[in-house]
């Protein structure tokens, strides 16, 4: 009988992960090296730190240089700029504020910033800011916006191209403002709210918005056109692209997001679930708060094509998921992130409890990152 049911399982094709031989540490290291080494060569990446979460624990791999001039190697402690992966932290912090009853995604934006008196802001909700559907806020906050007065002027003068909740246009100016307003009821500045409500409870002790003096020795240089660069400060940078961290903290971040049931803090646990909830469908992709999800299984080319800037940064029509769907374990959950000198990628599949973090000190095309990550995770199944 036992043999018969085993045969049935094989015939039904449900045996893949249940009956797959576990990948050994040595095999995993080989898969990572055989994927990352040619990628770095092809994309001229000076240094990379990779974490693979497999069988309940992170495995770390480091390659190349954190600082070319000083000949400093990348280590698991090296700090990288996350770029837009910072948005996943903003999404979870916003989710935590919702869980505490401080804000609601259905609230009007003007409730948290009454000075926004422009007619165009009527009918724009916190949800629209958080998910890039306010009507066409720009990718970047303009450089001339340097203080709160010019920030207010910028948002007052902005005119939407589309009705709220109809079109997704990826924008730092959208989720950045969501993050800034979401913490207002807490009475804390953004950095303090992030530290006390998200970073500390998850023991992410080497994750920073502003890298302290004592940690500067670990901060990698980014490289752009052969020059060493780091991100410049800007309005709403903390919320949209300002987090710096190491591969160990990022692995812990992925594990917390992949298994929120293991998070002790009740509002944070709920905040993580809200960030991976599905608010809009855009083609085969679902928009969360910071996180983006596709139904698993998904073909590599679907994920790769969706990550291309031509698609990711294009205005696309949205279909509302109403009510929002709670997190789906059979999902490819991911986010890309770049600054002038850094390029990162994070992806995980909650159902399989596998995930990957790829941090690099140069910005290179998203499709190459996604392809490499997919290849490595595919080898674990």
From Swiss-Prot:
Q: What does the record give as EC number?
A: 3.5.2.6
What GO molecular function annotations does the UniProt record carry, in alphabetical order?
Answer: beta-lactamase activity
Impact when changing residue 36 to V: In strain: MHN1 and Q980R
Give, as one word, the top-level EC class. hydrolase
Where, subcellularly, is it found? Periplasm
Q: Which residues form the active site?
A: 84, 170
Please tell me where substrate binds in this chain.
335-337
* Catalytic activity from the UniProt record: a beta-lactam + H2O = a substituted beta-amino acid
Q: What outcome is documented for mutating residue 319 to V in this protein?
A: In strain: Q980R
**Record's protein name:** Beta-lactamase
State the gene name recorded for this protein: ampC
Main localization is: periplasm
Regarding protein family, the annotation reads: Belongs to the class-C beta-lactamase family.
Remarks, miscellaneous: The sequence shown is that of strain P99. The class C beta-lactamase family has a specific amino-acid numbering system known as SANC, for structural alignment-based numbering of class C beta-lactamases, or else the simpler name structural position. A multiple sequence alignment was used to derive a consensus sequence and then the consensus was numbered taking into account insertions and deletions. This allows use of identical numbers, e.g. for active site residues, despite differences in protein length.
Q: What does this protein do?
A: This protein is a serine beta-lactamase with a substrate specificity for cephalosporins.
Recorded GO CC terms: outer membrane-bounded periplasmic space
For the biological process aspect of GO, one term held by this record is: antibiotic catabolic process
By its UniProt entry, which InterPro entries does this protein fall under?
Bact_CellWall_Synth/Modif (IPR050491), Beta-lactam-related (IPR001466), Beta-lactam/transpept-like (IPR012338), Beta-lactam_class-C_AS (IPR001586)
Domain of life, per UniProt, equals: Bacteria
């Amino acid at each position: 009988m036992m043999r018969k049911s085993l045969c049935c399982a094989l015939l039904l094709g449900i045996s893949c992960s249940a009956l797959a031989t576990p990948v050994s540490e040595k095999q995993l290291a080989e898969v990572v090296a055989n994927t990352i080494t040619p990628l770095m060569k092809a994309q001229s990446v000076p240094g990379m730190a990779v974490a693979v979460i497999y069988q309940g624990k992170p495995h770390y791999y480091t390659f190349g240089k954190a600082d070319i001039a000083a000949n400093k190697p990348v280590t698991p402690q090296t700090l990288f700029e996350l770029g837009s992966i910072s948005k996943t932290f903003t999404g979870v912090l916003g989710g935590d504020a919702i869980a505490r009853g401080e804000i609601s995604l259905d609230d009007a934006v003007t409730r948290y910033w009454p000075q926004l008196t422009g007619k165009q802001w009527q009918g724009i909700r916190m949800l629209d800011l958080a998910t890039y559907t306010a009507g066409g806020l720009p990718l970047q906050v303009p450089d001339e916006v340097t203080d709160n007065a010019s920030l207010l002027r910028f948002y007052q003068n902005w005119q939407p191209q589309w009705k709220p909740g109809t079109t997704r246009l990826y924008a730092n100016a959208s989720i950045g403002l969501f993050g800034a307003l979401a913490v207002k009821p807490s009475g804390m500045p953004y950095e303090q709210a992030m530290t006390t409500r998200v970073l500390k409870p998850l023991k992410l002790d080497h994750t920073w918005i502003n890298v302290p003096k004592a940690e500067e020795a670990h901060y990698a240089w980014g490289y752009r056109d052969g020059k060493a660069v780091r991100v410049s400060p800007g309005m709403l940078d903390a919320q949209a692209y300002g987090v710096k961290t190491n591969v160990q903290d990022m692995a812990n971040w992925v594990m917390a997001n992949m298994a929120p049931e293991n998070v002790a803090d009740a509002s944070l646990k709920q905040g993580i679930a809200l960030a991976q909830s599905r608010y809009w469908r855009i083609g085969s992709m679902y928009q969360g708060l910071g996180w983006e999800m596709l139904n698993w299984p998904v073909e590599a080319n679907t994920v790769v094509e969706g990550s291309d800037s031509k698609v990711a940064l294009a205005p696309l029509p949205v279909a509302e998921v109403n009510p929002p769907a709670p997190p789906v374990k059979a999902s490819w959950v991911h986010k890309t992130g770049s600054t002038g000198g850094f390029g990162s990628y994070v992806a995980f599949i909650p159902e399989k409890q596998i995930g990957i973090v790829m941090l690099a000190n140069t910005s290179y095309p998203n499709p190459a990152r996604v392809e490499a990550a997919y290849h490595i995770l595919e080898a674990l199944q």
